[in-house]
Amino acid sequence: MQDVETYLSTAPVLATLWFGFLAGLLIEINRFFPDALVFPSL
């Protein structure tokens, strides 16, 4: 079990999980608020 915890705490694994979570969050926000990522004033 110690080896699994060590593996999951490495930088590439944490980065993959973080960016996957962030991408999913942005996709869901863009689904409910489709114009939020577009700046109409520009």
Curated annotation (Swiss-Prot):
The keyword Thylakoid applies. It is a single-pass membrane protein. GO terms for cellular component: chloroplast thylakoid membrane; photosystem I. Pfam families: PSI_PsaJ. The chain crosses the membrane at residues 7-27. GO terms for biological process: photosynthesis. The keyword Plastid applies. Belongs to the PsaJ family. Its main location: plastid. It is found in: Plastid, Chloroplast thylakoid membrane. SUPFAM superfamilies: Subunit IX of photosystem I reaction centre, PsaJ. Keywords: Chloroplast, Membrane, Photosynthesis, Photosystem I, Plastid, Thylakoid, Transmembrane, Transmembrane helix. This is Photosystem I reaction center subunit IX. Signal peptide: none annotated. May help in the organization of the PsaE and PsaF subunits.
